[in-house]
Amino acid sequence: MPSGFFRAANNAAIAADARADVARRLANATTGWNVVAVGTNGRPGLGLRAAKEEEGIDRALTDCNRQDLRCHVIAIGPFSVEPLPVSTQP
């Protein structure tokens, strides 16, 4: 599995219209486990501030499955989130 920095603002797996919101929500989730899942159409699901890794995964997949199909986890962990580039800030 690849490792490194996860950048929601430019991650091609996430639908373009959802990237800034995912990045903002991750930046605000400063404690616990944070998980991002996406489905076949790139609709994201988030599991934020979970006490346990498994809890975050379950939340993200449940959230994703409400709006997309065949959801899978694309990022997991306590994130260090960098600010959005000036051109993509709301």
What do these predicted regions represent?
Residues 1-90:
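Secreted/extracellular ectodomain signature
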